[in-house]
């Protein structure tokens, strides 16, 4: 629904996610994905589950999230949100994105995945996607000018 903004994170301000929910409710041949790093799910706990409205959570290991995902919900809060939605009947998509190489890469991601699937219902996961950091060259230049010390933006 939005490439540049986490709509669920600002749902309490603008209600765009709920508006999309109601827009798609009777359009069974159309699917919408709401991708988020937020845990702001309260509104969806009181709405009927729609198979064509996909709530997708982007996850990173806690240490990577703390370092690189400022002002987002913690990894454990996102997992808690997933669990709450699943308990209400929602199926979710899991997005491990962006995959970031660190010294403890295998350990961090293994522990994250083990914890995640020890807490949530794997049968209520639509799928799991894995992605790398990607952006246009022009936007990357702008981000590098604004974030001179970012490891992610200067990674080969």
What are the roles of these predicted feature ranges?
Residues 1-44, 49-80, 91-95, 125-131:
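Core AdoMet radical
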Residues 3, 10, 21, 71, ...:
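Sequence-level detector for tyrosine residue identity
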Residues 12-15, 41-49, 105-113, 139-144:
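Distinct, well-ordered alpha-helical segments
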Residues 29, 121, 148-149:
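Residue-level recognition of short, structured coil/turn motifs
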Residues 78-139:
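Conserved C-terminal portion of the radical SAM core fold
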Residues 141-156:
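Acidic, Ser/Thr-rich peripheral helices and adjacent loops at domain boundaries
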């Amino acid at each position: 629904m939005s490439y540049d903004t986490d709509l669920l994170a600002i749902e309490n301000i603008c209600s765009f996610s709920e508006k999309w929910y109601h827009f798609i409710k009777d359009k069974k041949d159309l699917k919408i994905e709401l991708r988020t790093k937020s845990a702001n799910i309260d509104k969806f706990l009181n709405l009927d589950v729609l198979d064509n409205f996909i709530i997708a959570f982007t996850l990173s290991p806690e240490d990577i999230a703390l370092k690189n995902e400022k002002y987002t919900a913690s990894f454990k809060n996102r997992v808690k949100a997933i669990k709450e939605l699943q308990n209400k009947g929602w199926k979710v998509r899991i997005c491990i994105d962006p995959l970031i190489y660190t010294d403890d890469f295998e350990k961090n991601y293994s522990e994250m995945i083990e914890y995640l699937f020890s807490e949530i219902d794997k049968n209520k996961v639509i799928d799991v996607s894995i992605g790398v950091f990607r952006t246009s060259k022009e936007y990357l230049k702008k981000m590098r000018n604004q974030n001179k010390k970012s490891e992610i933006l200067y990674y080969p």
